[in-house]
Regions:
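Single conserved hydrophobic/aromatic residue that forms the stacking wall/gate
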Residues: 1-20
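Conserved, structured C-terminal
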Residues: 14, 18-249
Length: 249
């Protein structure tokens, strides 16, 4: 919405229309996602590179298929007119039975994105942080022409960051949650922006903004869970290896 306001301010003569209410998104993630969707679509999905998309048809329903996701797995996101979404969803569920396809909700997706260290708007991303602090400097091209926020980002990069987003793994039993306090030698140094139990790691994990002096891998911390200090340490992100197919075609 900030981008929308910026466009309206800088180019008031250009029209903007809301299309998201007319569009639905279906995300199919996992190692069999390409084979499954290919059964419903004539477009050669193997030719779609990571973070690329193509216009396509599924059962004669026009859609956009992107090789993107929020899980750390190879997968696709299908953008389609909302009135066709239910039919396509049911077809995916039926055709997905041989692949053991399972419908999942936001809870499962949130665990997967946390294991990848992916930032979530409202948690790791808001008006009080920036892409450099969040580890998203790879999406910022400061050598490009002027864009909203460029001057501020360049100034901060030149001066050096005062804090960074880090991954934290519990060393003892416990389930960390957002806003739990993070301590170093008894002193408060931050609070978790996200936290959960990782079934893959069999450990509690979380994300937190801390001063750069605490960002070194292996730094010992404590997470306060129900008034108890649970030992933790700063670990490398992502928590698990990514399995996205990053080869661009």
């Amino acid at each position: 919405f900030q981008a929308e306001d910026g466009i309206r301010d800088r180019s008031p003569s250009r029209g903007l229309g809301d299309v998201y209410k007319r569009q639905a998104q279906l995300a199919v993630q996992g190692k069999h996602s390409e084979a499954l969707i290919q059964k419903l679509c004539d477009t050669p999905l193997g030719e779609i590179g990571y973070y690329h998309f193509r216009k396509a048809k599924i059962y004669n329903f026009e859609c956009i298929i992107a090789r993107t996701g929020y899980t750390g797995e190879d997968g696709f996101e299908i953008y389609i007119d909302s009135k066709y979404a239910e039919s396509v969803y049911k077809s995916l569920i039926e055709e997905g039975k041989p692949f053991n396809l399972q419908p999942i909700g936001l809870g499962a997706r949130d665990t997967l994105r946390m294991e990848m260290g992916y930032a979530l708007y409202g948690n790791e991303l808001n008006e009080n942080c920036n892409p450099l602090e969040a580890g998203l400097g790879w999406v910022i091209k400061l050598q490009k022409n002027d864009f909203l926020g460029k001057a501020a980002l360049k100034k901060q990069k030149d001066a050096g960051l005062s804090r960074r987003l880090v991954g934290i793994r519990l060393l003892d039993r416990g389930v960390p949650r957002p806003h739990y306090r993070v301590l170093n030698e008894g002193s408060l140094i931050g609070e978790l922006t996200s936290g959960t139990f990782s079934p893959s790691l069999n450990a509690g994990i979380g994300l937190c903004y801390v001063s750069t002096e605490y960002t070194k891998l292996g730094t010992k911390l404590d997470v306060e869970i129900r008034k108890q200090k649970v030992p933790a340490e700063v670990v490398k992100l992502p928590f698990l290896p990514s399995r996205v197919k990053k080869t661009n075609c």
